[in-house]
């Protein structure tokens, strides 16, 4: 797929401004003077922008090639810039030319207060840019890779330009596993050795058939839904591929060692209460309970559950009526974010601020790495990113999928309560609804045949209305 414009600085690449790398100067006196001025400006920028997180764009200072009238002018400029940046009233995200205000950020169920009046005296408050960025940079970042073993019988040893949806989905599922094993408050440690569970999670997303949730195994599992090396796929097919892969892994592990590689039930939500096309997807409480029961091998106890809700919120562009509802899902404690992005370009949207979506970008190309499951001294830097990028919510592709993780029955009940309240705010056009039960003849968690959806996730022609079109404000299952 065509990647988003990469205007940011990779977290793994060195920034000459931050590290003080200055090109050598020539011997002429005029050039020495010019170089001295460049060094002065570089030092100023380094001081202003140097932080543990690369949150600023590294632009070449065009004024460095011009001789200022006096050094005091440079000092005044730096003092003003420092005051603006260090005040905390404004900050700049990579991937945009817009300086955002100090509005609250909602990030995977947590609210971060970024106001200029934020105080460090309240250690329990989720406030401050640094606190948010520590959370952001602790999320698992999975990108294009090159140099891995060929996928199946193909010759593909890289997923560059086509694997962004797969990588975005891996990020969402990885967060679910992090939340399950380590908790929502977990942050990436600064020193080794690392937590064995953290390393074990990264190992599962390695790029080989030996890794449970690798791109190799996802493509194999999603073959009947159109997943193939070199081809792009939509959110619905991606969710179904995960459903198949999780089921396959569970069956294999039960035969081999009796252990679960995926420690939760998986519910791909689709359809409506009557199993008909055209309505909002429905979370059925009885279906979720049955999936948990199946996960627990017939026991009635509840289990952790991952919900994936693939949606279409318009035709060529997202219908504006759904944007406030999408934003509110990030306030749910169970939020895992969204698989989405610009049309034809998938990203992992993990937060919102005002009318902007904050995302991790899978389009950076990195070399494939092999992190052994027991290597607690492994270099994990390529799985984390400190570059915050943003996108206007009204530019998001209408085809997307939302994820939620519920740890136990109480957490699931809280999710259902919040989802029901969201329905009440939807003015007749909800993202999805919640019901207790459905007709016995309907199998909502395995209803491709009922819905008339082909294996590749496309809608059959006879499902269109008499005019040959679907309503822009109606829901569809991809």
From Swiss-Prot:
Enzyme class: hydrolase
EC number: 3.4.22.-
Subcellular localization(s) per the UniProt record: Cytoplasm
GO cellular component, as recorded: cytoplasm
Active-site residues per Swiss-Prot or TrEMBL entry: 164 (nucleophile), 361, 363
Biased composition (Polar residues): 1-15
GO MF, any single term: protein-phosphatidylethanolamide deconjugating activity
Catalytic activity: [protein]-C-terminal L-amino acid-glycyl-phosphatidylethanolamide + H2O = [protein]-C-terminal L-amino acid-glycine + a 1,2-diacyl-sn-glycero-3-phosphoethanolamine
Keyword Amino-acid biosynthesis: no
Keywords: Autophagy, Cytoplasm, Hydrolase, Protease, Protein transport, Thiol protease, Transport, Ubl conjugation pathway
GO BP term (any one): protein transport
Family: Belongs to the peptidase C54 family.
Protein purpose: Cysteine protease that plays a key role in autophagy by mediating both proteolytic activation and delipidation of ATG8 family proteins. The protease activity is required for proteolytic activation of ATG8 family proteins: cleaves the C-terminal amino acid of ATG8 proteins to reveal a C-terminal glycine. Exposure of the glycine at the C-terminus is essential for ATG8 proteins conjugation to phosphatidylethanolamine (PE) and insertion to membranes, which is necessary for autophagy. In addition to the protease activity, also mediates delipidation of PE-conjugated ATG8 proteins.
Record's protein name: Cysteine protease ATG4B
């Amino acid at each position: 797929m065509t990647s988003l414009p990469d205007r940011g600085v990779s977290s793994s690449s060195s920034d000459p401004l931050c590290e003080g790398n200055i090109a050598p100067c020539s011997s002429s006196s005029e050039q020495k003077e010019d170089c001295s001025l460049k060094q002065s400006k570089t030092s100023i920028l380094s001081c202003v922008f140097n932080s543990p997180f690369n949150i600023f764009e590294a632009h070449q200072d065009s004024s460095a090639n011009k001789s200022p009238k006096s050094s005091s002018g440079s000092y005044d400029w730096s003092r003003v810039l420092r005051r603006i940046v260090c005040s905390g009233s404004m900050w700049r995200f990579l991937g945009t030319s817009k300086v955002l205000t100090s509005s609250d950020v909602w990030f995977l169920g947590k609210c971060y207060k970024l106001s200029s009046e934020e105080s460090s005296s309240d250690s329990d408050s989720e406030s401050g840019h640094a606190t948010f960025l520590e959370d952001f940079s602790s999320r698992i970042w999975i990108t294009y890779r090159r140099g891995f073993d060929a996928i199946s019988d193909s010759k593909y040893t890289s997923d560059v330009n086509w694997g962004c949806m797969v990588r975005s989905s891996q990020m969402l599922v990885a967060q679910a596993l992090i939340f399950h094993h380590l908790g929502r408050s977990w942050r990436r440690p600064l020193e080794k050795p690392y937590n064995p569970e953290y390393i074990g999670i990264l190992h599962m997303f390695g790029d080989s058939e030996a890794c449970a949730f690798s791109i190799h195994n996802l493509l194999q599992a999603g073959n009947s839904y159109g997943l193939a090396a070199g081809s792009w796929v939509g959110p619905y097919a991606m969710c179904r591929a995960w459903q198949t892969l999780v089921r396959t892994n569970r069956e294999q592990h039960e035969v081999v060692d009796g252990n679960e590689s995926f420690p939760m039930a998986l519910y791909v939500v689709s359809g409506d209460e009557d199993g008909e096309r055209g309505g909002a997807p429905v979370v059925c409480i009885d279906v979720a309970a049955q999936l948990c029961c199946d996960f627990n091998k017939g026991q009635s106890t509840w289990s952790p559950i991952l919900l994936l809700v693939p949606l279409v919120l318009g035709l060529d562009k997202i219908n504006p009526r759904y944007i406030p509802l999408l934003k509110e899902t990030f306030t749910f404690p169970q939020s895992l974010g969204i698989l989405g992005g610009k049309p034809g370009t998938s990203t992992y949207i993990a937060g919102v601020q005002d009318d902007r979506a904050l995302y991790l970008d899978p389009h950076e190309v990195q070399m494939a790495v092999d992190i052994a499951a027991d290597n607690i001294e492994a270099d994990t830097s390529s799985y984390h990113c400190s570059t915050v990028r943003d996108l206007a919510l009204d530019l998001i592709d209408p085809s997307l999928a939302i994820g939620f993780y519920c740890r136990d029955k109480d957490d699931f009940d809280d999710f259902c309560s919040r989802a029901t309240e969201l329905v009440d705010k939807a003015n007749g056009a909800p993202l999805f609804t919640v019901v207790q039960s459905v007709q016995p003849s309907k199998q909502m968690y395995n209803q491709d045949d009922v819905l008339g959806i082909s294996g590749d996730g496309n809608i059959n022609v006879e499902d269109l209305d008499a005019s040959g079109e679907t309503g822009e404000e109606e829901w569809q299952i991809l």
